[in-house]
A protein has these predicted regions:
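Flexible, glycine-rich active-site loops centered on histidine and acidic residues
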Residues: 136-170
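Structured loop/turn residues at beta-strand edges in well-structured enzyme cores
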Residues: 3, 79, 138-141
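Conserved catalytic cysteine-centered active-site region
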Residues: 38-44, 48-60, 89-143
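Condensing-enzyme catalytic core mediating Claisen C-C bond formation in acyl metabolism
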Residues: 1-56, 159-218
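Phosphate/pyrophosphate-binding loops at sites that engage ATP/ADP/AMP, CoA/4′-phosphopantetheine
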Residues: 66-82
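Short amphipathic alpha-helical face segments that pack within enzyme cores
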Residues: 61-66, 126-130, 165, 169
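Acidic, glycine-rich active-site loops and adjacent beta-strand->loop/helix elements
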Residues: 14-17, 87-93, 119-122, 147-153, ...
């Protein structure tokens, strides 16, 4: 499907990554393969390093950390945006939605449209399209689009095929109406025929008994 949106623009983009960094060479000992074969895979795939959370850091922690930074630095006001979209495949809980968790933890206004989208690889594009559609509403001036995942807990460190691909992190894009902005074109297609290749268990990141601590992302 082809999309075209006019009078929309990205006002800013922030990324949030954990400080904990691991290299493929450091993790090779976990893989049940001869080092020579793993090194060949590293060369073919271009594996180098990835960022992983420590402790019980969850998706909402990364989102809260990033938004709080924007507030504290004066780059975004708490009341500047009217919709919050969180795109994630690793929500804190089955319910409530992670977007509502973020809204509550930051004490954002109640008149804020909160929406979760369960998407992975196409998540930024899907979230962007949804943000553009929301901006059709007169009441919505800006949208905060958060793409975040903490997937390292869902993949075994011994899985040589998947673990090197996994990283934890978040991005926050601020999208707004802008008169005279060039047309933004997008194309999106879906194929769920091989869904079994991406199936994951239904575990959530944070149990009901766990209360999020004041945000300290490392």
């Amino acid at each position: 499907m082809n999309f075209a949106f006019s009078q929309r623009r990205f006002a800013g983009l922030l990324t949030v990554v954990p400080s904990n960094e691991r290299t493929f060479l450091e993790e090779m000992a976990n893989f049940n393969f001869p080092p020579a074969r793993s090194l060949k895979l590293k060369e073919v795939m271009g594996y180098d390093r990835h960022r992983l959370v420590l402790g019980d850091v969850c998706s909402s922690d990364l989102a809260v950390h990033g938004l709080q930074y924007l507030f504290d630095s004066g780059r975004l006001g708490r009341d500047d945006f009217d919709a919050l979209i969180v795109v994630t495949q690793s929500p804190d809980y089955l319910m409530p939605p992670t977007s509502s968790v973020v809204q509550g933890r930051l004490g954002l206004k109640h008149d804020l449209f909160c929406l979760d989208i369960a998407q992975g690889c196409a998540g930024f594009l899907v979230g962007m399209i949804q943000a553009f559609l929301l901006l059709e509403q007169e009441a919505i001036r800006k949208v905060a689009l958060v793409n975040v995942d903490v997937l390292s807990r869902k993949v075994s460190p011994r899985d040589r095929n998947s673990y090197p691909l996994i990283g934890d992190g978040a991005s926050i894009a601020v999208i707004e109406r802008s008169v005279g902005a060039p047309v933004i074109h997008a194309n999106l297609k879906m194929d769920g025929a091989r869904r079994e290749a991406l199936l994951a268990d239904g575990r959530v990141a944070r149990e009901r008994s766990q209360r999020p601590e004041p945000c300290r992302v490392q």
